Amino acid sequence: HAITEKGESVWIAQRNGRTKDGNDATDQGIIKMFGISKREDKIKALSELNIVPLSISYEWETCDYMKALELYQSRSEKYVKKRGEDLSSILSGITSFKGDVHLTFCPMITEQDLMAYDSLPGIEYNREVAKLMDCRIHAGYRLTPNNFIAHDIRFGKHEFKGDRYTDEQKDRFLHHLKKLEKYDVDEPEVLMDIFLGIYSNPVDNCFERNH
């Protein structure tokens, strides 16, 4: 109603909460929800919404230490949030230093795009549309030196050194990474790998989508 009749713009998250591991993926349930308005015409249900995927990238990921710790603890047991943790994370996400922030308004999802999936049953249709949105979001992601530094460290390479980052930028990232040492965990190398993944996974996603 707000979009098709009142002509208003509406921002909708691609999933319940921002990903913690750097692998952004659209929840198929969101696509299913969009289709409820016109069950008899799944193409028009989405095309008339004029969906424009938005890609947001940060130089410094918000709450990166906390995300890494939560993922680390979730490997062996269900992570139980402390009282007030959600509010604290929201406030930290708003106020913490993010460095360079870049927003890309990606190509709109058109009726022509959707027609490619017209013959698919509901579940497959939702999955393919979600993948299309992910493809455009990843293509619009602005990678920063931190992403390439983390990728090189994680995989023991120097693939991006020089072209994508300088020694000074790497030293700054290593200083940030060193703060992980204050967390007392049984497997610090696993925690570090998870932390590096938060920054390096977008590199794999972007390169996969662009090749």
Predicted stretch roles:
Residues H1-V10, G17-H211:
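Membrane-interfacial terminal anchoring regions of lipid-handling membrane enzymes
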